[in-house]
From Swiss-Prot:
GO terms for cellular component: extracellular region. Keywords: Disulfide bond, Knottin, Neurotoxin, Secreted, Signal, Toxin. It is found in: Secreted. Expressed by the venom duct. This is Conotoxin Cal6.36. Disulfide bonds join 24-39, 31-43, 38-47. The cysteine framework is VI/VII (C-C-CC-C-C). The presence of a 'disulfide through disulfide knot' structurally defines this protein as a knottin. Residues 1-22 form the signal peptide. It comes from Californiconus californicus. Probable neurotoxin. Transmembrane segments: none annotated. One of its GO terms (molecular function) is toxin activity.
Length: 52
């Protein structure tokens, strides 16, 4: 039971991590949905800096 929880958590962290750090122009990135005219690079930092 405990192993399943840990695995689920790991998958969640990886998925969110990929979305956050993905290229802004990538449809899978978090920023793509928040702000379609996103610059390339670290979407999360860009969004935080620009208040998106």
């Amino acid at each position: 039971m405990k192993v399943t929880c840990v695995l689920t958590l790991a998958v969640l962290i990886l998925t969110v991590g990929q979305m956050v750090t993905a290229d802004c122009r990538s449809p899978g990135s978090w920023c793509f949905y928040k702000h379609s005219n996103c610059c390339s690079g670290n979407c999360f930092l860009w969004c935080v800096q620009n208040g998106k």
